[in-house]
Structure formats: structure tokens, C-alpha cells
Amino acid sequence: MYKLASCCLLFIGFLNPLLSLPLLDSREISFQLSAPHEDARLTPEELERASLLQILPEMLGAERGDILRKADSSTNIFNPRGNLRKFQDFSGQDPNILLSHLLARIWKPYKKRETPDCFWKYCV
């Protein structure tokens, strides 16, 4: 009986930090479904780039979301166009320009070999 009570207290002790985590407001989350037939044709690099394009605006909005909410707390309705305008006013930069700069750093151009006489590690 003593072991059962100590196990329950231990379980509740580990469960308590998980229950104290904040819940996300369902109005702020945008659900995006992608078509499976389109994703099947994309290369891994294109999938990575597409996932960055989807994730980055959400991350930027989460970082500055508290500041923007304090600035305009009168509206509780989610408006993506309005959030883009708020982002432009706050940072002074277009989000598309920021995304293109970040993606340009990731992309590496394909380099051809200088000597066509070499195959794999064997050169003639």
C-alpha cells in the first residue's frame, strides 16, 4: 500500500509541470493542409524550402506577437493581411524580402567538375 501511494505521488509530481504549460489559442493557429500528390513530385530541397516558407512567418509572428498585441489590443479577430502590415510597420521590412534573403543563403549552386576525364575517384 505504501508503494502504491508513493508511486501515485511520484506520478502526480511528474504530471504537474505538464499540466501547467500554457495552451495555445485556437484562433491564432492556422491550419494548412497540403495536397499529397503535389508533395510526392517535389525534391527534398524543395520540400525543405516549402516547409521553411510555412514555418518562418509563424515563428516571426510568435516572437513579435506579444508586442503587436499590446500595441493593438482592441481587435481579437485573426486577420493575416493585418498581421503582415503590423510586421511591416514593426520591422520596416517586407516579410517576403526577409524570406528570400534567408532562402538564398541556404541554396548552394551545383558545381560541375573541371576535368571530365575523371570518373568517381579514378582519373585517367
Curated annotation (Swiss-Prot):
Main location: secreted
One GO location term (cellular component): extracellular region
Keywords assigned: Cleavage on pair of basic residues, Disulfide bond, Hormone, Secreted, Signal
Subcellular location as annotated: Secreted
Record PROSITE patterns: UROTENSIN_II (PS00984)
Summary of the function given for this chain in its UniProt record: Highly potent vasoconstrictor.
Family the UniProt entry places it in: Belongs to the urotensin-2 family.
Name the UniProt record assigns to this protein: Urotensin-2
